[in-house]
């Protein structure tokens, strides 16, 4: 029997799919190379934006004519699970994020829907079927307690549940034994880790991970700026394994919009935090997220965001146009929605600005020697692709063949907004 998994959305979803793949493989299933050859199709869904839901619905609908057994899981299961079961009789089961480890229990018998905020079986992540062995993602928690007004995650993934630290450390050890050199710790707001445990916090966990032999780089995504303390940053800066790249979701550069979003910080506080990170971590790169067109965003609000983006000089910015999510506070502000064409124009303007900023920042890398972790080889061009400690993508040539998981010194000879180019130094 063969299975195939479609995954939509964030890195946490990709990690969940690897966990489910591991469960299926350990029970005798074989992963199919394509959906046509499969007997079971698992669709891991995302509800952060409407577009992600529409893509998943399109996939579910298209599978009807193939006659496959279908299981739908992920965030969309929590908010549209009943609708999916009623609209699509070919769907065998719907599993919310807390129930994904129960995949084997729902493959036969009556159609089932398992949703709700239950205790997550984190132990199942230890048997994840990872696509990459050298760079792995490890889930340290589920859920969120912050309730930003635009965000559906607390409603789909529930409240914060911290994973047992010894379970996390053991998974990291197993990954290292299997070839991992880079570990990325995953959580909705990773610095909330440990709030439901005794004697643990996020930085304590990172400090323990750093003691494991073979861990060369540690990354994490993402901390909430409101809860990221200077003492945390100082402790992290003292760990040589922690990569000098910090992703801090800003969401808006206007204080009034931040207040309406329930982000719990001001632009001044955010700028102070970034300044402290830049002082504490040599050659650090900073990334962020922005939402454009939040309900009630005026031209003045937008211009404040534009100016703040200019001021902060982020290395990379992931932007999205606001998408109303059912059940969230912001979605009830229909009378103040920003017209789609206005939001798109603002998005384009910010993107053009950030392209210039990123291009300017990346020019500083030209002529430098960077330690690059190899991710893959481009079979078409014969070039290799990897990442610097600051998470810059590097495309380079090498006289000798190099493999994923190797660290190579690369001389950078060209830089664009999103990619560096170079040659291996050896």
UniProtKB/Swiss-Prot annotation:
The keyword tRNA processing applies. Residues 363-426 form the TRAM domain. Its EC number is 2.8.4.3. It comes from Coprothermobacter proteolyticus (strain ATCC 35245 / DSM 5265 / OCM 4 / BT). The keyword Ribosomal protein does not apply. Catalyzes the methylthiolation of N6-(dimethylallyl)adenosine (i(6)A), leading to the formation of 2-methylthio-N6-(dimethylallyl)adenosine (ms(2)i(6)A) at position 37 in tRNAs that read codons beginning with uridine. This is tRNA-2-methylthio-N(6)-dimethylallyladenosine synthase. Binds 2 [4Fe-4S] clusters. One cluster is coordinated with 3 cysteines and an exchangeable S-adenosyl-L-methionine. It comes from the Bacteria. It catalyses: N(6)-dimethylallyladenosine(37) in tRNA + (sulfur carrier)-SH + AH2 + 2 S-adenosyl-L-methionine = 2-methylsulfanyl-N(6)-dimethylallyladenosine(37) in tRNA + (sulfur carrier)-H + 5'-deoxyadenosine + L-methionine + A + S-adenosyl-L-homocysteine + 2 H(+). Residues 130-360 form the Radical SAM core domain. Monomer. Pfam families: Radical_SAM (PF04055), TRAM (PF01938), UPF0004 (PF00919). InterPro entries: Elp3/MiaA/NifB-like_rSAM, Methylthiotransferase, Methylthiotransferase_CS, Methylthiotransferase_N, Methylthiotransferase_N_sf, MiaB_methiolase, rSAM, rSAM_horseshoe. Belongs to the methylthiotransferase family. MiaB subfamily. Keywords: 4Fe-4S, Cytoplasm, Iron, Iron-sulfur, Metal-binding, S-adenosyl-L-methionine, Transferase, tRNA processing. It is an enzyme of class 2 (transferase). Residues 1-112 form the MTTase N-terminal domain. SMART domains: Elp3. Its cofactor is [4Fe-4S] cluster. [4Fe-4S] cluster 2 binds at residues 144, 148, 151. [4Fe-4S] cluster 1 binds at residues 10, 46, 75. One of its GO terms (molecular function) is N6-isopentenyladenosine methylthiotransferase activity. It is found in: Cytoplasm.
